[in-house]
Regions:
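Long extracytoplasmic/lumenal interhelical loops at the membrane interface
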Residues: 70-74, 78-81, 198-261
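Hydrophobic transmembrane alpha-helices and their immediate junctions
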Residues: 111-114, 260-303, 331
Length: 338
């Protein structure tokens, strides 16, 4: 129906069609995880996902140290996206897999998962984006809270780990905060980009112009446009408002989904992670288990990144590893990883 309507109004294009394919890849991965006997081992699924995050983080660290690959913003500024083209995609993917590593460590008490988390934390920070800086800090803080203050039915922290975490909070965490602030102040591009931190948050990571243009475009929609979207015409009309040389998204997933695909399709796409988030919140308050705790953090970060920086609902890379969380949530009573 979307394609037919967009063909009628002249809004159908390979670009919008590929966006739909990328999103539907999520359902393909979910179906594969749930239906294929090869993925019946939860340990195998979790380890494979975490290994991807570790390898991606090592690539970022290697590229940063030896100054190869793509710069995050420009070649002269802090940050690298290694050999990955989409900085936000790989950044959010590593953040989600870092959360998975934290969960796996507390579930199994296998120190290899903790080491994986530390590697991914370092790799994510070297991307140099606001999302990676604050996302990593949020994950580490959530880990510290879970160790020091939370009471889980299936996990209890050792006294040794609590002492290490306290030392980490007072020494390493302060060092990282000071280091990040220093990097931003000394880097000409980042210092301009994050000159007013509150303004950055209020303007949705500098996307205020993109959002304004998209809202103006959607404001002119008729009833059918609202239902089925305008496809590439949505991007073209944004381009006119922005005076850009090419069609442009708002880079805020809910707005882009509604603009290109309409509210009907967007509702079903946006609904699943939001439904799982509330389900995990309810489950956590009911049973206080470790999977619900980390799933809430992962889903909150995914949805927050979708609204703040985009590249979540529309990224096949991110969606593939979000599917791992959905897979674990749907099988929470059967999980036995090592």
């Amino acid at each position: 129906f979307l394609s037919v309507y967009q063909l009628i109004i002249g809004g159908f294009s390979s670009r919008t069609f590929m966006m739909l394919i990328k999103i539907l890849n999520f359902y393909f991965v979910i179906s594969l995880l749930l239906g294929c006997k090869y993925f019946s081992s939860y340990t195998q699924v979790v380890r494979s996902a975490i290994w991807y995050g570790v390898i991606a983080a090592f690539i970022l660290i290697y590229c940063f140290v030896f100054k190869v690959g793509y710069g995050s913003y420009t070649d002269e500024t802090f940050g690298t996206k290694g050999f990955f083209v989409a900085m936000n995609d790989v950044g959010l993917t590593i953040l989600l897999l870092n959360i998975l590593a934290c969960y796996s460590f507390q579930k199994t008490k296998n120190n290899n998962y903790l080491l994986a988390s530390l590697v991914m934390s370092g790799g994510a920070c070297l991307v140099g984006s606001m999302a990676c800086f604050f996302g990593t800090a949020f994950i580490l803080l959530s880990f510290a809270i879970s160790v020091l203050f939370m009471d889980f039915e299936d996990y209890k922290s050792s006294r040794t780990l609590k002492i290490i975490v306290v030392l980490f909070l007072f020494v390493i965490f302060n060092f990282l905060v000071i280091k990040i602030i220093t990097i931003i102040q000394e880097d000409s591009f980042l210092s301009r980009k994050y000159a007013d931190i509150m303004e950055v948050f209020l303007s949705a990571s500098g996307r205020d112009r993109l959002i304004d243009a998209a809202v103006r475009t959607i404001g002119n929609f008729n009833v059918f446009d609202w239902f089925f979207g305008k496809g590439n015409l949505f991007l073209i009309e944004n381009q006119r408002y922005l005076h850009f040389e090419a069609p442009k998204e708002a880079e805020v997933d809910p707005i882009d989904l509604i603009g290109q695909s309409g509210i009907i399709f967007s509702f079903f796409i946006l609904y699943i992670p939001i439904k799982k988030l509330f389900s995990c919140i309810k489950g956590f308050f009911k049973k206080h288990n470790i999977l619900d705790y980390w799933s809430v953090i992962a889903l909150f970060m995914f949805i927050g990144h979708a609204c703040y920086g985009g590249h979540a609902y529309t990224s096949p890379l991110v969606l593939s590893y979000l599917a791992v969380f959905i897979y674990l949530i749907d099988n929470k009573n059967k999980i036995n990883i090592s």
